[in-house]
Regions:
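Dynamic helix-loop-helix/coil hinge segments at AAA+ ATPase domain boundaries and subdomain interfaces
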Residues: 34-57, 64-76, 172, 176-180, ...
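Canonical AAA+ ATPase core
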Residues: 149, 204-211, 220-275, 284
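Conserved catalytic network of the ASCE P-loop NTPase/AAA+ motor domain
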Residues: 127-129, 140, 158-162, 189-199, ...
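Conserved C-terminal "switch" segment of AAA+ ATPases
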Residues: 158-163, 244, 248-251, 257-258, ...
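C-terminal engagement/docking regions of AAA+ P-loop ATPases
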Residues: 326-367
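Flexible beta-alpha connector loops of hexameric P-loop NTPases
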Residues: 171-181, 205-217, 264
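Short glycine-rich substrate-engagement loop in P-loop NTPases that contacts/grips substrate
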Residues: 163-193
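Walker A/P-loop
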Residues: 77-90, 117, 121-164, 188-191
Length: 367
């Protein structure tokens, strides 16, 4: 029967229906689908993000069919071309410092060569013909970091990335205090991520709208160069608001945006989705939800939750504090069950904290 896959749930159902057996011949790579089942299940359980989930499925099918790869076999003329020798020298130098042992991380100083030196049967391992670099647009608290982590996990399991390595950085991790040191600092971070994923959260903070920051220019130019130089060895994922990324990141280098060939956009959560996120966090923490406030309560108060999922996490934390006070001295059957009173009191604490944060910020403006 023909197999149609449109959604993540279709892949999960397929692995349920066909357990992997190495003695059975399949017309699809069922073993690989089983390998990515766990991160796909986590992604499928995330609230909302239907467009992102569909795009991820399309990417997976594309890569599983190996349409991203250039020809595996090289002629003698190909091997002796300037372009190939330049790449070979680059990778040989890289592998002397960062070599890969299966089942472990990259080890400095090991003697591993990525290329078979036999000219009669010279092959390239996992040579991606496409950029892997990705941009995730969206406001804070909408799951951008979690999506990035799952992408890294999935792509390492199917062999597109050589190791399951994920490094999250911000401006302070890339930009140094003196001109000239920023490029070195940025290159060191990039080399540390080779074979895996470099995730730059709030990448717009690297630059500014005026474009006058020499440190930012140095950092972003170094990133841009590395996007091509390590095209087959690195995935860079950036995240942030679309307008700010366009103004404060992509505008620094004309060739930058075209290197990010995959893009996703996380959307603001609805009141119903905020409720689902809170209930999910409660249940996953081993607690139970018994509040009857319902959708209307979240609809009335959703404007207070500008950071969406992150604010639901904060609300749950404060609800546990309020719950602890409410059940003090009561029997065990009342414990670890969040009710309406806990949520209402937690919301008051949440608003008080926001007021204090705003007051502190305003006072600091005059220091």
């Amino acid at each position: 029967a023909d197999i149609k896959i449109d959604k993540i749930s279709d892949i999960i159902k397929l692995t349920d229906k066909y357990p992997y057996d190495n003695k059975v011949q399949y017309n699809i790579d069922i073993n690989m689908l089983h390998k990515i089942r766990e991160p796909l299940k986590k992604m499928n359980d995330m609230i909302g993000m239907e467009n992102i989930k569909t795009t991820i499925v399309n990417q997976i099918l594309y890569y599983l069919k190996n349409f991203h790869k250039i020809s595996n076999k090289l002629s003698f003329d190909d091997i002796n071309s300037d372009k190939f020798q330049s790449r070979y020298n680059r990778d040989s130098s890289y592998n002397r410092d960062y070599s890969y042992n299966r089942g472990s991380s990259y080890n400095r100083g090991s003697s591993y060569n990525r290329y078979n030196r036999s000219y009669s049967n010279f092959s390239i391992q996992n040579d991606n013909n496409d950029y892997l670099h990705t941009v995730i647009y969206g406001p804070p608290g909408t799951g951008k970091t979690e999506i990035a982590r799952l992408i890294a996990d999935i792509f390492s399991r199917i062999g597109i990335l050589k190791r399951n390595y994920f490094k999250k950085v911000t401006r302070s991790d890339l930009i140094a205090g003196y001109l000239g040191q920023t490029a070195i600092k940025t290159k060191d971070v990039i080399k540390d991520c080779l074979g895996g994923v470099l995730f730059i959260d709030e990448a717009y903070a690297l630059g500014n709208a005026e474009g006058r920051d020499s440190f930012s220019k140095e950092c972003i130019d170094t990133i841009c160069e590395s996007l091509s130089y390590y095209k087959d060895d690195l995935m860079v994922i950036i995240a942030g608001y679309k307008q700010e990324l366009d103004t404060c990141f992509f505008s620094y280098n004309k060739g930058l945006e075209s290197r990010f060939t995959w893009s996703y956009e996380t959307e603001k959560y609805s009141a119903k989705q905020l409720q689902q996120i809170l209930e999910k966090k409660i249940n996953e923490s081993g607690w139970r939800s018994d509040f009857k406030l319902g959708h209307k309560w979240f609809e009335k108060n959703k404007d207070s939750f500008a950071s969406f999922g992150r604010d639901m996490e904060t609300l749950f934390m404060k609800a546990k504090i309020c719950h602890s006070k409410r059940v003090f001295g009561l029997s065990d059957e009342n414990k670890s069950v969040i009710n309406d009173e806990d949520i209402e009191n937690a919301y008051k604490m949440f608003l008080d904290n926001k007021k204090n944060e705003t007051k502190t910020f305003n006072n600091n403006m005059y220091i």
